[in-house]
């Protein structure tokens, strides 16, 4: 009987000492699916083409960080289908912006 009480108290102590919530480290993916390329672009032409585009200069943490990173270099955050020589075809605003 004493062994059972000691075992239960030990398990209870371990359970209470564990962290209440485990924070998951999920990487931010700004663009997915067909529009899978994250870009910072200067000019949008009716959502069909974007001009003067480049990869974001920093690793992105969230949608707001993506927007501010591109804004810091005078460009807009975009998710594009096909980047070709600084011009991107079919772009849209990233989710969360």
Curated annotation (Swiss-Prot):
Intrachain S-S bonds: 31-79, 40-70, 41-53, 80-91
Record localization: Secreted, Cell wall; Secreted
UniProt xrefs under Gene3D superfamilies: Hydrophobin
Entry GO terms, CC: extracellular region
Primary subcellular site in the record, as a coarse category: secreted
Highest rank taxon of the organism: Eukaryota
CDD domains noted in UniProt: hydrophobin_II
Glycan attachment sites: 62
Subunit structure: Homotrimer. Further self-assembles to form highly ordered films at water-air interfaces through intermolecular interactions.
Its biological purpose: Aerial growth, conidiation, and dispersal of filamentous fungi in the environment rely upon a capability of their secreting small amphipathic proteins called hydrophobins (HPBs) with low sequence identity. Class I can self-assemble into an outermost layer of rodlet bundles on aerial cell surfaces, conferring cellular hydrophobicity that supports fungal growth, development and dispersal; whereas Class II form highly ordered films at water-air interfaces through intermolecular interactions but contribute nothing to the rodlet structure.
The protein, known as: Class II hydrophobin NC2
Organism: Neurospora crassa (strain ATCC 24698 / 74-OR23-1A / CBS 708.71 / DSM 1257 / FGSC 987)
